[in-house]
Amino acid sequence: MDFELEPSLEELIKQDTLKWIFVGGKGGVGKTTTSSSIAVQLALQHPNDEFLLISTDPAHNLSDAFCQKFGKDARKVEGLSNLSCMEIDPEAAMSDLQQQAQQYNNDPNDPLKSIMNDMTGSIPGIDEALSFMEVLKHIKNQKVNELDDSKDKISYRTIIFDTAPTGHTLRFLQLPSTLQKLLGKFQQLSGKLGPMMSMLGGGGQGQQDMFAKLNEVQKNVEEVNEQFTNPDLTTFVCVCISEFLSLYETERMIQELMSYQMDVNSIVVNQLLFADDDENPCKRCVARWKMQKKYLDQMAELYEDYHLVKMPLLGSEIRGVENLKKFSKFLIKPYDPKVDRGIITDLKEQ
């Protein structure tokens, strides 16, 4: 390449068309801190717009990151009025799904009902499917809210996802195309089963409602599929640390994302020591920094057309809005150990 991309997420933060930002990577590399930092910077840079941060990771950490309890409903972040957070609870969502199924069919002996209960309890990736249904719900709400001028309705400019570790995330992102095919087959099946059920005395209003709902879901899924593959609307931020396994996982994930035609052009590398710029570095720090630099050099060569953001290792956990505000600045303005070391050592313990 004739030019080098900025080692920051400034371009992403300023982009005014993005609706969906996914943040993902291997477990334990700082996904929640990174997704929270991106959300905080978006809220700070665009104070007149609303943003939503959703955790789809079953091991929810948003409440810990912001020192504030979040649940399945969007709740405003204290100290940042235009940012809301929510944590999707698969078990609660499963319970809601089964209750909704009860509305369509109250016969406990119906074999179709038994099959549906077995399916929802045993499908691999059901957590991801339920998380995805929450996404569909938000798309529907967005459409309604954009047409509604009342002040109590919130239309989010961008929704940021703090995702589960890589395997779960890739299954989650496969769902739009998988569901699209599955719902298409359901539609074909409903066309054949409908007349048969009527002849057998079944197929009342409840089943008509169910097929109508499937139609609506299919349209929403098709729309999500289009949005997820549009680089103006959706992007994925990879998070890793400068070690072999993390680099390997990141490359695997990027290849998968490209196969889904999803935009990915940013990588955040966390927990860097920058021992060269320390006046009195310990021997262990120097040895580890030497290893980190080796993999950083490989990343720089492998991902020369990506925004490669280098974030420092901190002396304490990043918790609370004020600490996130300080740390998230390095996503916009690259960390300089000679100038910024004082900032990361002065973070307040929460």
Residue map of PLM features:
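C-terminal lobe/tail of nucleotide-utilizing enzymes
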Residues: M1-K14, N225-Q350
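Nucleotide-state-sensitive switch-loop elements of NTP-binding domains
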Residues: M1-I21, K26-V29, T34-E222
